[in-house]
């Protein structure tokens, strides 16, 4: 390897070599390099909302042995960070990620400042092989055996003859998202496996944390494992119609298991002014002391909740139930949208002993799709773009 090969141009090749390190006080996944051919377990790339990586390593570049790396990854998520690397966050960093399902490289160093999106959409839930190779001052990238990218003249002469150290972050960033050349949502609901980095295979230790959805057959969707939740401010989502007043939402339920809260409208101090609970493959609508409604669920049909000044309606396909709420209760519900702490909650409520888990194909509010990335807060274990493929998988998933 010539000394003209810049640090930044090697960032695609170097990842997760030992020893383990910590980032922002958290203990990150421990990895062990080996030389054998046995496959290591797939790694889940998401560490929840935000930009926190799942692992951070500091690498001595004098220890690299081969200018070649490869890995396989799969995702249904169209956007997020696969990995980031730097020698310093100000003027020498690199990012490989996805945007609109396509690979994207962002690079900032003294010799090259660029953003390149390329190749086919890879967020199809299938495993894709990525290979990376340095040749002189050029970087070549293959996907599934086809060369998709060659970057030239992205290196320069180093200030000294020794390689500096480098930080590598998997599934996240070590600089503010706003410092990217073209900001994106860092969290990526995806997995990586069969990775070889400069001649080393990296294996998780037996004490490594949960592997997310990497050992489950997937389908597109939004999955709430048992005990997880998300909250949206009512002021940040599409607003009710005003003349006459009405509000509607629609949930595309694919899978449900267990019992517990599905959805609630309320505040911080009273989270369930109106709620939908899952119970034995049925949904129960309740509002305070008013009589409850029970509707048997039919998977595949959208579940609709509509409120107006006269009634609350729950429907699915041809089935419709009307909640016999009082005029004063309906008037109180309407005040939620002017309450500074008005919330739409999905999943388990605080203090709720919920065993429910469920998969949504879509969530629509006032005819507009609601993005989980817009949540005020959410559990880190929510799968933002994938669900178990079979109902048999749901009850066996633990986070």
Curated annotation (Swiss-Prot):
UniProt cross-references to SUPFAM superfamilies, sorted A to Z: Concanavalin A-like lectins/glucanases
Pfam families (UniProt xref): Laminin_G_1
Localization recorded for this chain is: Secreted
Task: Name all Laminin G-like domain ranges.
Answer: 43-214, 221-387
Residue span of the signal peptide, if any?
1-29
User: Which GO MF terms are attached to this record?
Assistant: steroid binding
Residues glycosylated per entry: 160, 270, 353, 377, 393
Query: CDD domains, per this entry?
Result: LamG
* Disulfide bridge partners, by residue number: 191-214, 359-387
Q: Which UniProt keywords apply?
A: Disulfide bond, Glycoprotein, Lipid-binding, Repeat, Secreted, Signal, Steroid-binding
Please name the PROSITE patterns in this protein's record: LAM_G_DOMAIN
Q: Which residues form a coiled coil?
A: none
What does the entry's PTM section describe? Differentially glycosylated in liver (SHBG) and testis (ABP).
Q: Which GO terms describe its cellular component?
A: extracellular region
What does this gene product do? Answer: Functions as an androgen transport protein, but may also be involved in receptor mediated processes. Each dimer binds one molecule of steroid. Specific for 5-alpha-dihydrotestosterone, testosterone, and 17-beta-estradiol. Regulates the plasma metabolic clearance rate of steroid hormones by controlling their plasma concentration.
Q: How does it assemble?
A: Homodimer.
Q: What is this protein called?
A: Sex hormone-binding globulin
- Taxonomic path: Eukaryota, Metazoa, Chordata, Craniata, Vertebrata
Task: State the gene name recorded for this protein.
Answer: SHBG
């Amino acid at each position: 390897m010539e000394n003209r090969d810049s640090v930044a141009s090697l960032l695609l090749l170097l990842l997760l070599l030992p020893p383990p390190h910590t980032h922002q006080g958290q203990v990150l996944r421990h990895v062990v390099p080996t030389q054998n051919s046995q496959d290591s377990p797939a790694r889940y790339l998401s560490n929840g909302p935000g930009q926190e990586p799942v692992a951070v390593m500091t690498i001595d570049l004098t220890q690299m042995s081969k200018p070649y790396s490869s890995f396989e990854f799969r995702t249904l998520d169209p956007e997020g960070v696969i990995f980031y690397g730097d020698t310093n966050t100000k003027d020498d960093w690199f990012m490989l990620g996805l945007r609109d399902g396509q690979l994207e490289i962002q690079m900032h160093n003294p010799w090259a400042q660029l953003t390149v999106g390329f190749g086919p959409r890879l967020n199809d839930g299938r495993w894709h092989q990525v290979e990376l190779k340095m040749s002189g001052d050029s970087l070549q990238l293959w996907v599934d055996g086809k060369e998709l990218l060659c970057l030239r003249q992205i290196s320069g002469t180093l200030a000294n003859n020794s390689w500096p150290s480098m930080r590598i972050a998997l599934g996240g960033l070590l600089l503010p998202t706003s410092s990217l050349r073209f900001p994106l949502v860092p969290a990526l609901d995806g997995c990586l496996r069969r990775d070889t980095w400069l001649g080393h295979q990296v294996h998780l230790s037996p004490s490594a944390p949960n592997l997310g959805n990497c050992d489950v057959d997937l389908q597109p969707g939004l999955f709430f494992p048992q005990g997880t939740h998300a909250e949206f401010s009512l002021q940040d989502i599409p607003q009710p119609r005003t003349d006459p007043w009405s509000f509607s939402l629609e949930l595309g339920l694919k899978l449900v298991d267990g019992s517990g809260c599905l959805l609630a409208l309320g505040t911080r101090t009273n989270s369930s002014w109106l709620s939908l609970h899952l119970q034995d493959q049925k949904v129960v609508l309740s509002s305070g002391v008013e009589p409850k409604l029970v509707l048997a669920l039919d998977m595949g049909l959208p579940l609709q909740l509509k409120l107006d000044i006269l009634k609350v309606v729950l429907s699915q396909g041809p089935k419709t139930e009307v909640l016999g709420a009082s005029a004063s209760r309906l008037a109180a519900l309407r005040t939620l949208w002017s309450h500074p702490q008005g919330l739409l909650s999905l999943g388990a409520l605080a203090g709720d002993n919920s065993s429910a888990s469920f998969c949504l194909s879509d969530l629509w509010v006032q005819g507009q799709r609601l993005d989980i990335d817009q949540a005020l807060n959410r559990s880190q274990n929510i799968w933002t773009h994938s669900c178990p493929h079979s109902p048999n998988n749901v009850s066996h998933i633990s986070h």
